[in-house]
Amino acid sequence: MSSDVSQYTIGGVKIMFPCKAYPSQLAMMNAIVKGLNNRQHCLLESPTGSGKSLALLCSALSWQQSLYEKSLLKSSCEKEDREPAASLPCRCVCHSRSESSEATAGASHGAACSNNYETGGSVKHGDQLSDTECKENNTLASKLSAKKRASACGNECDDFQVERKRIRPLETEQQVRKRHCFSKEVQLVDALEVYNQRKNGELIVHSEKSVKNTSPQTLFSSCTECSCSSGKETRKDSGNTKKKANGDQTFIPKIFFGTRTHKQIAQITRELKRTAYSGVPMTILSSRDYTCIHPVVSSSNSNRNELCVELLEGKHGKSCLYYHGVHKLSEHYALQSAHNTYQAWDIEDLVSLGKKLRACPYFAARELMVGADIVFCPYNYLLDPQIRESMEINLKGQVVILDEAHNIEDSAREAVSYSVTESQLNAAREELDFMVNNNIRQKDHEQLRAMCCSLTNWLRESSSQLVETGYETSCKVWSGKEMLNHFHDMGITNISFPILQKHLSAVLEKEEKISMFGKEELVEIPIVSSATQIVLKGLFMVLLYLFKDNSRFADDYRVALQQTYAWTNDNQPDVSDTSAFFTKTKHKRNLRHKTVVHMLNFWCLNPAVAFSDLNDVRTVVLTSGTLSPMDSFSSELGVKFSIQLEANHVIRNSQVWVGTIGTGPNGRKLCATFQHTETFEFQDEVGALLLSVCQKVGQGILCFLPSYKLLDKLKDRWIHTGLWRNLELVKTVIAEPQGGAKSDFDELLKIYYDAIKFKGEKDGALLIAVCRGKVSEGLDFCDENARAVITIGIPFPNVKDLQVELKRKYNDQHKTTRGLLPGSQWYEIQAYRALNQALGRCIRHRSDWGALILVDDRFRNNPNKYITGLSKWIRQQVQHHENFGSALESLHAFAERNQKGIDFSSQCSNEVFHVPLNSKEPSSASQQEATIHLSPDVPVKSEEQSFVPETHLTTTINSINPGPSNQPGGQKVDVESCSHNGIQRRKHMDSTPRRPANKTEKKSDRTNSDFMKEHCCFKPLTSTPLPVATNCVSTASSKQRKNVNSASELIGGVNQCQSSFTLEHKPSIPESHLETTNFSVKSTEAPVAEEHLDEQKLQIEPCSELPSVGGRPELSVLEISAEDEDESLYFTPELYDDAESEEQEMRPLDPDENQIECGKPTVADDLFVISTSKTLSEPKEMINDDGRNTSLHGTMLSDISKNSTVNIEKMTNGEEAEQVESQEVDTKKRKISLSRSRNKGVSPFLLDSTST
């Protein structure tokens, strides 16, 4: 964990953050804390790479820790209220038996202290003590107790007792667990017996019930003459704040953190290790595929769950040795916080420790869930009712965080859907028939067999009613209510279904009590196979939702009976004589025949059915980098998300190139509809486009296609035309396989990464993948692994898919009654979510860069329809290119700047954001994107993650008048850190390389990049200007006399001046002290310069009204003096939204408009405080409503005036008088112009200041 920890106070919760937070992280933490406090649900979108995982972990865990602190404080107050009533010492037998024990000493200490505090008569009472108590006073324990009592009562507080009360139960429980684990009964018990007891609820290891039963208080007989035993139990319960003893006030919710895959869990736990909360008790729930270490089970390719159960049952005479050692792993010091050595761990850490201790990681992780504060798991563990039941997950009153939740709707529907084939039903019926015929729980199995027989008979009868829907496919669909009528005919009703559930529970019991010779003994009973159990449990799960709440969800289901054909191979053995004369031919040995497959599908079309089980959850937080469009979540899930947020990305606009391309290199239109993708012209044009991009962009490139079918078509076509070979000459080409083993896919990824890492003759690699495939979900392609992402077309779901068709009709049917989106709109949203997920593979962290290329003519022709579905940070920067040539030229210039090793510092000194070649003037949207809007009185204290403030000296230029930047300052800056601002050369920046250094710059051996590094690391960021160096002045003056003809030459002089300034005024204070002063500056072109854009010559205007060198400069443009500000900084999340409209940017901020976006619920009504030990001294009045730092502008003009004054002294008297007169006129004009342009949206306070 980083030593530079920042502390923020949000909603009354102190959050320890491992570094200074991004604005998007502050907004997320504020939203989460508000949702947790108010029991509201949150829907938060934050782009990948913006640090949303850290924000989720720190905010949720800090809120949980605050509840522990409140509970501890409350228990200490309750103890102080209770102790005066227990002033008389206890006279029971249990106390007299342990006179000198620590418990007795503590009780006498508490009584004496209470008497002294309440009545003040403890001395008199001490004279009347009995002989036994007088004898006790002579012991060592009594002397120590007296010292403690004197210390506690002298301070008139109960700190010592509170601390002792909090520690003692933990030590006692730990000793009890050790005695319990190393007792002979536990060591010698059979694995089958332990497993059965746990299934029956007779043995619950480390649960609240078992801890209570094995507590020291229950080891002795309770005393009935006094309330000592109840007092002990009360103290014990108060120590365990997780128990719901006094209602919701003492119940501390667990945090269930769900992600999509196990690999994402590993990424989350790595982030947890960075935080101050890495010591919280945790566990990771996962499948046996990841955690089983048994050599036989783990090496098997079959169902590991079945093999594990067989070992636990000891069917083959062998038991699982690793299961016996679960307690050794769950109580190991590396996983327990009692030893203060606890750290966050990953599945790999648990597995390696389990192998070392020969203990089962799978069951150990489940045991650790009892005492864990945060539980990580794939989120289908929380949505699937069968998995929740098997893992014993209780979500009532808990906090559920679902990361990467863009597919949560599909996952919720799949969790409560079920499909079974006719052959599976027949196999289950035959096995149940076998149980009945052998008199094995005959009554129970008969009822289940009758249900399966009725269902198979109905399936056969219905198969004759199927309607052909395609080639060799036919189906028939029933609604849920219609299917209930059929179940009623089978004898399955809402009355008989609970009886069937009891029969199912009975047949799954592996043991049964049987009376033999007058004694009851447990006898093992055979049960049905795992395959039959899966069939029965799946059917009963669907029936449960169909009958639930008086068939409330029946209309949300569709039952589809599908008939398809499958080809099977009959590998018949060779039948030949010894001479092999009559051997069968090869084609006759491998016979293939077509078989009919009937599939019965119970499809849930409403994800709210699965989420109905989460109604008792305290707070649900859904977050992802690609939640957009966000309109469907509330209606689809049936959950009211009171808090919604679309956060901005943390990268600069110059780090990403986003463009749409509608034509190929040969000028053919590219529209990836089904009709066009079938033509050779489209396939060849896409191939030529892909080859051109690979030649211009180095390193790794990802290309996403809508479907595997199109991928196969393109690959076959390109191999036939030779284009595939041309691609392989440039890059290593890899195509994503459909299906296959995980190991094969991992091997292909390794080839891709190695081709980029170890460069040879080829420049990187090209990975052609499919949206919604393996590559587009959960994989991290950072830095050179994905310098460009190309998407071909829009990945709409298959319109001919029966489930998609039924879902669209379902939404159209209920769009008015339930507020669902229309079917067509839902259909489009599914496409954009998949597209955004594919685009999110690029730009994975703050310093990353890459290009996003959207190939389809529909984006340019109808942007209002097709662009609005993209993520917020992408749609704000989309540029439409008329032809492929201009797009490729702009893309090549973008890649050249970054691939040549030009760091962001020197790059950002010449540009603010990317504008393509066909853009003549920066648009209003682009100007909005170049800024982060701040409140006029809210200075931002930024961090190591934040942007770097503008550090260049600003000059007044006739043709360009750049305004100061508003980027927050004061953070640490590394080589990759840079500012947003500087003189903007938008028109030719993307197409022409950087101009060489001018003569002034060549005089120095140091580059502008070196100057920037030194300047950012050592120059104190302050609003008070420092004296300008002499060489800096001479440089500026020489620049003025030369009639500068280009902006680049002027920038060189300013950089040289700046470097000299930095070298002479390098501070001697530590770097940490240089981070304390922040100011905000904005780098957009001021409107006042528009009338001078046609002028060719640039010259520096001296300002005669500013003081000369050596004098104390004052703020001349807006005469406002800087004021010291309180250390606490206040934020609201909407301040960090840099996608506001131009009207909102130019008008004053309205308090009623403090919403995140477009009328959505407010994220932050309450301001949250950032507490820091660093001293802040920021002029509150320096920032206008539009984000311009007028104070800094005046400061920079002061520095320029010093240079100008030296130049004026060298002139003749006539020239000097003429120059000064010219300066005065220009300054007055400029002040008038500034008043027109900068007072737009200025607060009344600033307007009053300027008028003075």
Curated annotation (Swiss-Prot):
Gene Ontology terms for molecular function: 4 iron, 4 sulfur cluster binding; 5'-3' DNA helicase activity; ATP binding; ATP hydrolysis activity; DNA binding; DNA helicase activity; metal ion binding; RNA helicase activity
GO biological process: DNA repair; double-strand break repair involved in meiotic recombination; nucleotide-excision repair; protein-DNA covalent cross-linking repair
Binding site for [4Fe-4S] cluster: 292, 308, 320, 360
Binding, ATP: 191-198
Basic residues composition bias: residue spans: 1228-1239
Basic and acidic residues composition bias: residue spans: 989-1008
Cofactor(s) annotated in UniProt: [4Fe-4S] cluster
E.C. numbers: 5.6.2.3
Subcellular location: Nucleus
Catalysed transformations (reactions): Couples ATP hydrolysis with the unwinding of duplex DNA at the replication fork by translocating in the 5'-3' direction. This creates two antiparallel DNA single strands (ssDNA). The leading ssDNA polymer is the template for DNA polymerase III holoenzyme which synthesizes a continuous strand; ATP + H2O = ADP + phosphate + H(+)
GO CC terms in record: nucleoplasm; nucleus
Motif (DEAH box): 403-406
Protein family: Belongs to the DEAD box helicase family. DEAH subfamily.
Described purpose of this protein according to its UniProt entry: DNA-dependent helicase and 5' to 3' DNA helicase required for the maintenance of chromosomal stability. Involved in the repair of DNA double-strand breaks by homologous recombination. Involved in the repair of abasic sites at replication forks by promoting the degradation of DNA-protein cross-links: acts by catalyzing unfolding of HMCES DNA-protein cross-link via its helicase activity, exposing the underlying DNA and enabling cleavage of the DNA-protein adduct by the SPRTN metalloprotease.
Name of the protein: Fanconi anemia group J protein homolog
Native organism: Gallus gallus (Chicken)
Gene (name only): BRIP1
